[in-house]
């Protein structure tokens, strides 16, 4: 499942993040690449240990913790600290798949990458190209979202970023280890939760059907979740 999650950051929060990011020191993006990704990657990135990356990443994680749609879709167990990249002047990232396990350098913190996320930090009309293209059995899905919006997709997907030919694309990217490892199971839970929320809004939280479906949701989560 590929999902557009709007409004993770407000316009004011995006502006605050960009003020810090634009003044930071950026390095060759291959500093964090695996061997296969390094063959396809041409962009710039903030070093993982950068104080700016930590500060802006903390702000993003705080926003994610308050975002009900993100929690419902991802069911996060662990989130890898957000990283940051920028593309300009024809920079691109060719087709690749993300590493299955991400290790935070200098620590024993590990994340199984069940889901990948890209949070856009530049408005789409400010640059040409820079589309995130995610492949699945139904074809190629493209994302180029407003600043502050996030796209979530299975980390097992082949994906690429098209060349940026005008302006600059700035984004945060990170990985999520979900409580529910299987993408199909996680998607079913998300669909069920969405319908429960809609029914609750229509009939009220005390409606017998809402209570029954909520019980089914939690029993499925109990069956499938690692916690």
Curated annotation (Swiss-Prot):
Record-listed 2-oxoglutarate binding positions: 169
Please list the residue ranges annotated as the Fe2OG dioxygenase domain: 78-178
UniProt cross-references to PROSITE patterns, sorted A to Z? FE2OG_OXY
Q: Which Gene3D superfamilies match?
A: q2cbj1_9rhob like domain, Rabenosyn, Rab binding domain
Q: GO BP, one example?
A: DNA damage response
Q: Which domain of life is it from?
A: Bacteria
> Which Pfam families would you find in this protein's record?
2OG-FeII_Oxy_3 (PF13640), PKHD_C (PF18331)
Cofactor(s) needed, names only, are: Fe(2+); L-ascorbate
**Residues holding Fe cation:** 96, 98, 159
Q: What is its EC number?
A: 1.14.11.-
Enzyme type, top EC level: oxidoreductase
Q: Which UniProt keywords apply?
A: Dioxygenase, Iron, Metal-binding, Oxidoreductase, Vitamin C
The record, for HAMAP family, names:
Hydroxyl_YbiX
Protein known as: PKHD-type hydroxylase Bamb_4192
Question: The organism's lineage?
Answer: Bacteria, Pseudomonadati, Pseudomonadota, Betaproteobacteria, Burkholderiales
């Amino acid at each position: 499942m590929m999902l557009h999650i709007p409004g993770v950051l407000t316009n004011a929060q995006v502006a605050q993040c960009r003020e810090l990011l634009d003044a930071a020191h950026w390095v060759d993006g291959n500093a964090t690449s695996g061997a296969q990704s390094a063959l396809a990657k041409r962009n710039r990135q903030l070093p993982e240990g950068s104080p700016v990356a930590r500060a802006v990443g903390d702000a993003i994680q705080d926003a994610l913790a308050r975002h009900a749609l993100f929690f419902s879709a991802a069911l996060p167990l662990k989130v890898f600290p957000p990283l940051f990249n920028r593309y300009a002047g024809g920079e691109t990232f060719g087709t690749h798949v993300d590493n299955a396990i991400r290790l935070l350098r200098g620590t024993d913190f590990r994340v199984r990458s069940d889901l990948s996320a890209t949070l856009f930090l530049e408005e789409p009309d400010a640059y040409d190209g820079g589309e995130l293209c995610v492949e699945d059995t139904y074809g190629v899905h493209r994302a180029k979202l407003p600043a502050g919006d996030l796209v979530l997709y299975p980390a097992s997907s082949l994906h690429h970023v098209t060349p940026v030919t005008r302006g600059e694309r700035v984004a945060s990217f990170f990985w999520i280890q979900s409580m529910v490892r299987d993408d199909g199971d996680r998607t079913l839970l998300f669909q069920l939760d969405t319908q429960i929320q809609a029914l609750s809004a229509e009939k009220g939280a005390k409606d017998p059907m809402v209570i029954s479906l909520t019980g089914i949701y939690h029993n499925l989560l109990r069956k499938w979740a690692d916690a």
